[in-house]
Each structure stands twice: as structure tokens, then as C-alpha cells.
Amino acid sequence: MSFSKLQLIEPILKAIKLCGYTTPTPIQEQAIPKALAGLDLIATAQTGTGKTAAFVMPALQRLSVPSTSTGRSKGPRVLVLTPTRELANQITEAVKTYGKFMRIRSGAILGGMPYFEQQRLLSQPVDLIVATPGRLMDHMERGQINFSRLELLVLDEADRMLDMGFSEAVDTIAAATPSTRQTMMFTATMDNTMARLAQRLLNNPVRIEIAGKKTTLEAIEQRLHTADDMQHKNRMLKHLISDSGMTRAIIFSGTKRNADQLANELHAQGHSAAALHGDMSQNARNRTIMNMKRGKIRLLVATDVAARGLDVTGITHVINYDLPKNAEDYVHRIGRTGRAGATGIAISFASSREVDSLRSIERYIGQSIPQQVITGLEPARPLRRSSSGSSPAPSSGKRWQGASAGKRYGQNAAPRSPFGSKTTRRSDTDGRFSRDEKKSVRQDGGKFGDFRKSRPSSPSRWS
């Protein structure tokens, strides 16, 4: 099917053609016609499936028709809620891309950016706003935004918004909008919590489910390396990044502190490397991502929160320096590579301290991650991957598609620094309900927008 068959207007089709796209993705093919028909919908789809365009294009088409509102409100006709600033920026860029040949007044309301700029945006007529819940609530409490003419509410990555503690904020924002609005909800998982949210906010929604697990995993070669300790991880990393085939890579660290230290170490060794985490100002994060896209950065050391929604083409490798505590985050991490028909390589380090996380991941994806050994860097001890000594049973797929996220193992354990024996505080961890995410929530509320300088690196331990 071509985009022209989706009944999109000519200005949008012209923008799509300019981007070089010819065929809609499955989520676009299913969601766009229903959205254009004005139906509420729930779409279960993973990142990298084209879901952003699936709601941006119908939103723009709605804005091509004059508003029927008779009031004098300057508020938006379309509101897109998303959990992180990175996702908000990505959606804002999509609006500009597909609305290139339309006269659309749009803007972003998110933490880490000056209040006065957002106040100026809200004081003028605006058609479409992309926002993070925390900062939007701040403006609502100040009486600076009116939703009386809102026609469309989009919840992007709704499951992640709830995970980050935005459930009450989402309900409050939705309650401030007209009950006659159209609502579209996009989520990676569909559990009971999400079902209850949909029941509260949506009206007789159409359900769309796009399979994503097998497609994602089949495009990515997964590898596992057993690590004796942090020094062993460093030596293996040094070997792996010397591969000329590693054009562009994201290295995931479990803490903000270690992301800074690791990036500094890599930079000192002559690599074009930088860190990306929640303590950085929005401008610093945008600058880092732009440098990555332009090829100025080869190795990006990131935490889960900062990399959520990161859309950079040409990522050949993902390296899990630290395994995520949550199995779902593993899939989101490795999904940064192997996109848009390309293949990718995902390499994970696992020490004896991370066995529980590894077991959870392998149960979630329904397979064992093939183990490899680097000659000369063999582990001193084998990794006991399963309590029974057998491979994990194949997954039925239900956990991926609908059940709640996997249990967090070792939640109260303080991870060790990769550059010494000193333990880091749990407040530095980047787990699913970590304080890093909670701080990101507060930053979106505008209370903690400062930028902390990267800590100096510890003496090198790579030899």
C-alpha cells in the first residue's frame, strides 16, 4: 500500500515524498485511517515501528480544517503527551517534517527549558503542543493554558509515563480537556494498569496490535560476555571498540556517575566519546545528540532514562556495560540498533552480581543469549546462568504483548563503580523506578533544571 491510499492531504504527501518514504509501516497503515475517521484507538507497538508518524500525520490533517470552536481561547487543538524530553523533541521534529508545507503553529512544553519562552508560546494562538506531564502541570497550575478548544489528545509511550509516576498527572490533564475530544494511546505493553487507564480516558477505542519482538530480535545479533569484575569489563570494552566495523555505538551504563567516568576514560584514550544522562541540561543533551547524528561522536555512553526515544540512524552496536535491572529496558536498549531494515549487534557484559537480571532478560525474550569469549580475555569463572542449569523456556509472547513488566531483581543492591571498589549510592542508579527517573520527572516540572558538570575521571584501570 502507498501513502496516497491512506487519504492523506497533498501537503502531507508532499512532505512524505520529500523524506523519501514510499510505503507506510504496519502501524501507520492500520492507525492512520482510523485516526482520520475520528476514532479513539489503543496501539501496542514498539519503538522503531514508525508510530510517531502514525499519530503526527492524522493530527496535522485535522489541523488543516478550520476549528469549529466559537470561543476566544488561544489554547491548542492537539496535545501530545510523552514521558521524556528526548521523545518530545523527536515528536516536535516530526511535526516540522510532515507539516513542512502547512501553516501550523506548534511548540514544546518540557523541563530543562526556560519558562519565559514557554509562557510566550502559550500567550499566543497555538495549534499543537508536545509536552511532558510535569512541566505542563506547572503551567496549568499557573493558569497559563486553556484546553477548551482541544480536539485531539495523544498519549505516546503511555506505559512509560505511568512507570515514571505520571498517572495522576495524566488523569488531571485529561480531565481538563473536553469530553468530546478524540484520544489516541500508544504503548509498548498492555497490562491491567494500561487497560484501566484506557477505560478511564478513551471512548470505545479500536485496538491495534503490532508484533515487534521477533522482528526486533531477528535483526540484531545478540552476544554475551562473562565478566569477572569491572576491570575485566573495561579490558573487554577496550578490545571491542577497537573493531573498525563499530561505526557508531551506544554503551549503556547503570548510573549517571559511571556514564561520566566511562565517557571521560574513553575520551582520554583518543575516542570520540560523550556521556548522555539526566543530570545534563536540555541544551547539553540536545547538543550531544546532534553531535552523534552528525558523526562527531562515535561512542555514546548513556543511561536508560536519557536514551529513551533516542533516534539516531546508523547505530551498528549496542553495548550493555551494565545489564538493566528490568528486562523490558533490555529490549528498548538493543532496539537502538537494527532499525529500518538494517542489522545490528548487541553485546552484553554480565558478572556474577548480574545473574538475576540476565535470567529475567532471557525469560522475557524467550531465548538464551549466545555466549562468546575473547581470546586472551577469558573469564576466570563460568557464569551460572540458570538455577537448573538449563536454558530458559521459550516465551509464549504474552509477557511482551500484555503482562506487567518483569520483576526487578536485586533492587536494593548498590552497584559497584567500574573504576574502583567504592560503591555508588542507590540514588545514582538508572533502574525502572530509580531516583534518576524520578529526578527527570521533577526536572520536567521545572524544579531541577540545573546542569552538573561531569566529574573528573578516576585513574585509568584499563591495563
Label each PLM-derived region with a short phrase:
Residues 2-383:
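Conserved helicase RecA-like core
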